[in-house]
A protein has these predicted regions:
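Adenine-nucleotide phosphate-binding core of ATP-dependent small-molecule kinases
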Residues: 161-228
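Conserved phosphate-binding loops in N-terminal lobes of ATP-dependent enzymes
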Residues: 1-39
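Short glycine-aspartate micro-motif
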Residues: 15-19, 76-77, 84-89
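Conserved phosphate-binding catalytic cores of ATP/NTP-utilizing and phosphoryl-transfer enzymes
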Residues: 5, 41-85
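Short beta-strand scaffold segments in enzyme catalytic cores
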Residues: 87, 93-99
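Glycine-rich phosphate-binding loop plus the immediately following alpha-helix
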Residues: 56-58, 100-161, 165, 175
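Active-site nucleophile and cofactor-binding loops and adjacent substrate-binding regions
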Residues: 19-20, 40-50, 88-90, 108-113, ...
Length: 230
């Protein structure tokens, strides 16, 4: 598409067809055709997503990883025992898809609280002008300055009877209720970090309740790294 020259409007009757998927393939189809002479050959978004995930899991070495706390560990997937698995697609919202084989899948759940929620609320709560700026800001923050932890309720102790550590989040943004502080007393990076944790935890809880699959695959270009997380 980039030949070094500027694209011209209405380039005549000659058209170029390219594969496209997702909402933009429909939303911008007329614009691309009128301005660039490009016709979108549309492919189903979920078909492409599942096919791509299957390919990565079956072919690419160390494409999958898991997190334990803040530590990332790559894992090897047994291609002979891959299915079924749950594919969690995090975009503006979140879709959860049960994949049972090549071309065999169904959407089993989802939530409207996703990447769009993080960006929308983050834009309202901070002065960030882009998603990447908000994400970078969250990496520098400390959610403990904003979130109410189990230790805040139990005097710094674990609630071991039910398996809750003192560092577990009891209430996202909970300290904003109890602290004698004004809005400007809270650092934007701490707010961004708390928001990211809140949304990520919500997705994880929805995932855990959805289906007892042996393997759950989380895919998202952001806020996660561009690999497949288990």
């Amino acid at each position: 598409m980039n030949s070094g020259s500027q694209p011209q409007e209405n380039p005549g009757s000659q058209s170029i067809a390219i594969k496209a998927t997702g909402g933009g393939a429909y939303k911008y189809a007329d614009l691309f055709k009128e301005r660039l002479g490009i016709i979108f050959d549309k492919e189903d978004e979920m078909d492409c997503l599942v096919a791509g995930a299957n390919f990565l899991l079956e072919v690419v070495h160390q494409e999958a990883f898991t997190y334990m706390g803040d530590q990332k560990q790559f894992v090897q997937i047994d291609q002979n025992d891959l299915y079924p698995y749950l594919l969690v697609n995090i975009g503006s919202g979140v879709g959860m898809i049960k994949v049972e084989g090549e071309g065999k899948f169904e959407r089993v759940s989802g939530t409207s609280i996703g990447g769009g929620t993080f960006w929308g609320l983050g834009k309202l709560l901070t002065e960030c002008k882009s998603f990447d700026e908000l994400l970078d800001l969250s990496y520098r923050g400390n959610n403990r300055a904003v979130d109410m932890l189990v230790g805040d309720i139990y005097g710094g102790m674990d609630y071991s009877k039910i398996g809750l550590s003192s560092t577990a989040i009891a209430s996202s943004f909970g300290k904003a209720i109890s602290d004698n502080k004004e809005r400007e007393d809270y650092k934007p990076e701490d707010i961004a970090r708390s928001l990211l944790r809140m949304i990520s935890n919500n997705i994880g809880q929805n995932l855990g309740r959805t289906t007892p699959q042996k393997l759950a695959i989380v895919v998202s270009p952001r806020p996660y790294e561009p690999h497949i997380g288990i």
